[in-house]
Swiss-Prot record:
PROSITE patterns in the record: AA_TRANSFER_CLASS_2
Protein name as catalogued: Aromatic amino acid aminotransferase
Designated gene of the protein: pat
Species whose genome carries this gene: Mycobacterium sp. (strain KMS)
Enzyme Commission number(s) from the entry: 2.6.1.57
Function: Aminotransferase that catalyzes the conversion of aromatic amino acids and 2-oxoglutarate into corresponding aromatic oxo acids and L-glutamate.
Length: 358
């Protein structure tokens, strides 16, 4: 090929999604087992009547729905539509946030291991990823603070953390945000927040209101079950939202995805009630794995993390032989999605047999 490409791209790997194998149980991509509600299906079908038209590039109706939804849960006037940005999944908003803050020579801090897209997007922007090792499978916030330099522009906090399933203590997160210099953007990536239970639920939107440099990311892919439609949103200071609009790819969230998201907001209580079923299965699977002899951190997500180290690849290979597709992370461990009960049973049967082998 004679085209002159950016040479630095040669050293950047492509993002690797969870595999799909026909006939196998896929527990690799943290998808919900539930399909869309009838009301959401109806909204999707109705939206197909206008496929000859461009989608609303300003996401006006969706942003108004989101603002009203936040008002309902947080109190009147919590956020305005001008404080909400919509993207083609929260992953696209991650990229936009990097674009508006960081360029060559700048630094972006995040825990590691964490969401695999962070280092790829940072390097693509020409910036430098600063990976801070996890402590006990969760964010080491003190070490992340110590990693801040005069070149730091952005910090990602993936909470709950993907792939290790853990959550940051809310009080510790508040202290961390207060300690970060106000010119550095702190992005709290909450793709799995709906699965957090007990006193670990963060007041992330309160942090946005108290600190103009804090951004919260949410997605419709997980608890809302719209992974195939790719739509997410950010809640932030209005100036940040305006900047995000300057690096946004026009029309990237379709009319269908917007209609489905609006209908999902209207049915939020019913959809979020489904997470209780996932949490119950998560607790059952966790207890069974520990009883079988596995060591794993407490999960606050819709998946569990098995830190298998050098045994990771053998576990993945043998799982595939048993028609189970799980997600490996090098020689660190395996992420396993909480699925339907019968699928979880199949996985547990395999896991018990595997750990019992010499």
């Amino acid at each position: 090929m004679t085209a002159r490409l950016r040479p630095e791209l040669a050293d950047i790997p492509a993002y690797t999604p969870g595999k799909t194998v026909p006939g196998a149980i896929k527990i690799a991509s943290n998808e919900t087992v539930h399909g869309p509600l009838p009301s959401v299906r109806a909204a999707i079908e109705k939206a197909t009547d206008q496929l000859n038209r461009y989608p609303d590039n300003g996401y006006l109706e969706l942003r108004e729905h989101l603002a009203s939804h936040l008002d309902k849960n947080l109190g009147a006037g919590a956020f305005t539509p001008e404080q909400i940005a919509v993207g083609c999944g929260s992953v696209s908003l991650c990229q936009q946030l990097i674009q508006i803050t960081s360029s060559v020579g700048d630094e972006v801090i995040f825990a590691w291991r964490s969401f695999e897209i962070y280092p790829l997007q940072v390097r693509t922007a020409g910036a430098t990823p600063v990976q801070v090792p996890l402590r006990d499978h969760t964010h080491d916030l003190d070490a992340m603070l110590a990693a801040i330099t005069d070149r730091t522009r952005l910090i990602f906090v993936c909470n709950p953390n993907n792939p290790t399933s853990t959550v940051v203590d809310p009080a510790a997160l508040k202290r961390f945000v207060e300690a970060v210099p106000p010119h550095i953007l702190v992005v709290i990536d909450e793709a799995y927040v709906e699965y957090i239970r007990g006193d670990q639920v963060p007041d992330s939107f309160g942090l946005v209101r108290a600190h103009p440099n804090v951004v919260v990311l949410r997605t419709f892919s997980k608890a809302y079950g719209l992974a195939g439609l790719r739509i997410g949103y950010a809640v932030a200071d209005a100036d940040i939202v305006t900047a995000l609009g300057k690096v946004y790819v026009p029309f990237s969230a379709t009319s269908i995805s917007q209609a489905a998201a609006i209908a999902s907001i209207d049915a939020a209580d019913e959809l979020l009630a489904r997470t209780d079923q996932v949490v119950a299965e998560r607790d059952r699977v966790t207890a069974a794995l520990r009883e079988a002899g596995f060591t794993l951190p407490p999960s606050q997500s819709n998946f569990v993390w098995l830190p298998l180290a050098e045994r990771t690849l053998d576990f993945v290979r043998r799982a595939a032989e048993n028609r189970l597709v799980v997600r490996p992370y090098g020689e660190d461990g395996v992420r396993v999605t909480i699925a339907a009960p019968h699928e979880n049973d199949a996985f547990l049967e395999f896991a018990r047999n595997w750990i019992g082998q010499p």
